[in-house]
Amino acid sequence: IDKTEKCDSYTSDNLLGAAYVSADFNYSDKLNTNIGIRAEYYNLKIDGYSTDGLTPVNIDQKNMDIFPSVNIAYHLTDKNLFRVAYGRSVNRPEFREIVPYVYYNFDVFANISGNIDLKKAYINNYDLRYEFYPTAGETVSFGLFYKDFKNPIEQTYHEAGSGVQYTYHNADRAVCYGIELDIKKNLSFLG
């Protein structure tokens, strides 16, 4: 006997269309800039039922977003440069985070429910890097990064009956920062 309930399934359509344009500006042998802009049209449709199986849930989100980027490089020598960059990006809710149904997650031994009120998160990304190119195909770079999130999506939990139930919410703001070291070394000398 099939015991599938209306609230156990949903249908969805996801459309993302994008266009990107950029321009390079070389002010001198030492200083160059790349400026870009990305436009995205996003349409998300979800049809299903709330967890009671009685209330239809229809989501139809249409958005147009603009994401600028700027990358400035200053060449100290032909093998050394400093780079500063900015870019804006987005983190859209995944289907499982936004659909109005409950599923059991065996990794955390708890039910997880979606949240139809989730907003997308916008991220402003800032980078500062020093790059060194000792030989062709080799790179050493050291960087600092800072990311500022608006409406980040977080998993939260609450007591539900005899256990815990997880869901997703938007926090107001979050930041992430750190350092990066990247080394690309040609190992052809090993044979």
Q: Residue spans of the language-model regions?
A:
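Surface-exposed extracellular loop regions of Gram-negative outer-membrane beta-barrel proteins
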Residues: 43, 78-125, 144-166
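Residues that define the transmembrane beta-barrel architecture of outer-membrane proteins
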Residues: 13-17, 62-66, 122-126, 173-179
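Outer membrane beta-barrel strand-and-loop segments of large Gram-negative receptors
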Residues: 2-3, 7-10, 115, 119, ...
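Gram-negative outer-membrane beta-barrel proteins
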Residues: 9-11, 41-49, 60-62, 90-96, ...
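Membrane-embedded beta-strands that build the outer-membrane beta-barrel scaffold
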Residues: 19-25, 31-39, 68-76, 80-88, ...
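Signature of Gram-negative outer-membrane beta-barrel scaffolds
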Residues: 1-77, 103
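A short acidic, glycine-rich active-site loop
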Residues: 59, 112, 169
